[in-house]
Regions:
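Conserved GNAT-fold acetyl-CoA-binding loop/helix
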Residues: 4-28
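A short helix-loop-beta-strand connector motif used in the catalytic cores of GNAT acetyltransferases and
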Residues: 28-40, 62
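Conserved beta-strand in the GNAT
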Residues: 40, 46-55, 62-67
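A short, internal acetyl-CoA/4′-phosphopantetheine-binding micro-motif in the GNAT/acyltransferase core
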Residues: 42, 66-73, 102
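Conserved acetyl-CoA-binding loop-helix of GNAT-fold acetyltransferases
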Residues: 68, 74-87, 110-114
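Conserved GNAT acetyl-CoA-binding A-motif
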Residues: 82, 88-101
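C-terminal "cap" of GNAT-fold acetyltransferases
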Residues: 95-142
């Protein structure tokens, strides 16, 4: 529900987006077993941030569901979550971490770029609310 609350005001990120995210989380749980990790950030017993990594192969990891509640933005929590995910991927032997995002999230894309992710491709694809750009970014790990 954190995704639903955080994105509800953005055009194209309504209930269908929340259902799409719920579906991808269910797939992660069912298919991933112990091949990844989830981070949750709480403040006063309330969820204020999250992210996850799925180890997709021996060398590639996928960054998933980076989200920080509006009340906690601008304080470095997003950076801390993504940096923890990058460390985990690197320590797990991955030489590459990648993510998929879409348009309408310039703050997220700026954070990813600051942390060394580079744009690989942007192509139109059928997503939760019709055709949108699916943006692929990746970071090579040392």
């Amino acid at each position: 529900s954190l995704h639903g609350v955080a994105y509800e005001a953005l055009p194209g990120f309504g209930l269908k987006f929340e259902a799409y995210v719920a579906k991808t989380i269910a797939e992660y749980v069912l298919d991933n077993e112990s091949r990844g990790r989830v981070w949750l950030a709480e403040l006063g017993g309330r969820l204020i941030g999250c992210t996850a990594v799925a180890l997709r192969s021996r060398r590639a990891a996928q960054l998933r569901w980076v989200l920080v509640d509006h009340s906690a933005r601008g304080k470095g929590l997003g950076r801390q979550l993504v940096e923890a995910a990058i460390r985990y991927a690197s320590n797990s032997g991955a030489s590459l971490i990648y993510l998929e995002t879409t348009d309408g999230l310039p703050e997220s894309q700026a954070l990813y770029e600051k942390l060394g992710f580079e744009l690989v491709s942007s192509k139109s694809q059928e997503l939760w609310d019709g055709v949108r750009p699916l943006i692929l970014m990746e970071k090579h790990l040392v």
